[in-house]
């Protein structure tokens, strides 16, 4: 029951094809299975390669009550990075998993509770030529209602912190970047010119530490339409902070952060957790460096 089978494709600058299957009751109460096959072909945003990737993924999940959720699984990938003169191939087995502790009252726009997440991904070279790598993700968020309980349009304070730590092989082709809708808003996603600029090396690394705070105001409380879909609208101001580094994790604690500040409109709509529109300004060492408009399909916090 409630099984889902879906597929999709796109053509143009990013060519994709995928099949997805999800069964929330694969062996009984609270045990789920999801699996997918994907094929993608697109230009790397800041490295001089075209990425051609085929992957298969399978995960088993389990709820323990309403507040605890776990998942364990793996992904098998065949990835090629190509340009006119170079072709690099990766084939790896990638165990992955997560644990979530969640006491939020409303997932779409929580007014109280906490969200704790621990997750890992790994890459084990199937050809036996490369050292394995492991990445550990941690996040913690807290939500506080600032208005009286009977106010249908409350003020809400949301704060969150996230870390990413890489262990093992640090391959430059898998390096992450700061400054986009999911890390520090108010910055355009980096391009090749940013990556090749030594004065912007503070945006690229294997480890990172990020924090965000939002003051939210519900403008339109959630309401049903056709007894099937729910809509709502929330406005917010935000301040984001982040650092990233390439050597040891503790080194980033001594680095100057990049900042982002701005405004957000968050639409509760069908088929996505949230539809978020952000506009902000990016700062580094006390100077405004960038400005950007972002669209995302999930909360920042």
Task: For each feature predicted by the language model, list its residue ranges.
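Short, glycine/acidic-enriched loop or turn micro-motifs at the edges of active sites
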Residues: 243
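Outer-membrane beta-barrel and related beta-rich outer-membrane complex signature
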Residues: 47, 82-86, 169-176, 247-251, ...
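C-terminal outer-membrane beta-barrel translocator/porin domains of Gram-negative envelope proteins
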Residues: 95-229, 233, 237, 247, ...
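Short, contiguous acidic/charged loop-to-helix segments that flank catalytic cores in large enzymes
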Residues: 197-204, 248-255, 264, 283-285
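Secondary-structure transition/capping motifs at alpha-helix termini
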Residues: 1, 27-29, 147-152, 220, ...
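Gram-negative/organellar outer-membrane beta-barrel architecture
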Residues: 1-117, 182-202, 274-275, 282-301
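Short basic (Lys/Arg) and small-residue
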Residues: 240
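Short glycine-rich, acidic/polar surface loops and turns
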Residues: 260-266
């Amino acid at each position: 029951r409630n099984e889902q089978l879906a597929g999709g494709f796109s053509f143009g600058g990013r060519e994709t094809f995928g099949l997805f299957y999800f069964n929330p009751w694969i062996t009984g109460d609270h045990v789920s299975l999801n699996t997918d096959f994907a094929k993608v072909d697109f230009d790397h945003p800041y490295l001089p390669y075209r990425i051609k990737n085929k992957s298969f993924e399978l995960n088993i999940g389990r709820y323990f009550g309403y507040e605890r959720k776990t998942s364990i699984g793996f992904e098998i990938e065949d990835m090629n990075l190509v340009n006119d003169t170079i072709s690099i191939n990766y084939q790896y087995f990638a165990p992955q998993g997560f644990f979530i502790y969640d006491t939020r009252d409303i997932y779409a726009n929580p007014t109280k509770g906490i969200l704790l997440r621990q997750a890992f991904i790994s890459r084990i070279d199937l050809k036996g030529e490369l050292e394995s790598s492991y990445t550990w993700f941690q996040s913690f968020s807290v939500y506080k209602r600032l208005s009286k309980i009977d106010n249908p349009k409350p003020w809400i304070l949301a704060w969150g912190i996230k870390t990413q730590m890489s262990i093992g092989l640090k391959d430059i082709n898998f390096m992450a970047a700061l400054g986009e809708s999911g890390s520090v808003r108010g910055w355009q996603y980096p391009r090749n010119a940013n990556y090749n600029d030594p004065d912007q090396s503070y945006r690229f690394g294997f480890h990172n530490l990020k924090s965000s705070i939002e003051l939210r105001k519900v403008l339109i409380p959630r309401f049903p339409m056709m007894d099937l879909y729910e809509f709502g609208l929330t406005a917010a101001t935000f301040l984001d902070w982040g650092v990233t580094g390439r050597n040891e994790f503790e080194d980033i604690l001594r680095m100057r952060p990049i900042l982002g500040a701005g405004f957000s409109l968050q639409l509760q709509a069908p088929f996505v957790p949230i539809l978020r529109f952000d506009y902000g300004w990016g700062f580094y060492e006390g100077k405004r460096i960038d400005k950007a408009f972002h669209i995302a399909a999930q909360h920042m916090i």
